[in-house]
Amino acid sequence: FYTKYVKLLPKYYQDFWHLLKDSENIAPDAGLIITWRELGNLLARYEAYVKANPTQKELFCRLQDDYKFLQYAFLFGLDNTPISYDDVHLDNDVKKEWERFIKTYPNSPTTPFAKEMLQQKKFDDLEHMYNKLTKFQETSNYPLLKACPAKK
């Protein structure tokens, strides 16, 4: 219904709307219904939105929760879409996507975490990595992670 009206909005708002729509219901029942590559690209689109629209701080606040979820899903998987099926070997599709993401988006705030995840020998206890990402998300000055006025 809204699709026909979106094109009447300013470009920055059209891009915002498309990010929200493309992030909607990507993981029903804790399982991804998009590929790892699509997830990586969606995460990168959020990050590109910040660079393209640096003055849209209010919209960043509205994207914040989805962005955090995308980071967690990309790095740790979901209950029904794990990154490793035996806690030792990384899923090959995940590995390929992390490697592609690192190469394609070297300046992404997610890239250092993907690099570190690739160094893991086992995937049965990633609490230290999870905590590290959580701390980064809570303390970062990155526009999609900064404290928002209503969220303080």
Task: Pin down the residues of each PLM region.
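Acidic, polar-rich low-complexity tracts and alpha-helical solenoid repeat scaffolds
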Residues: 1-152
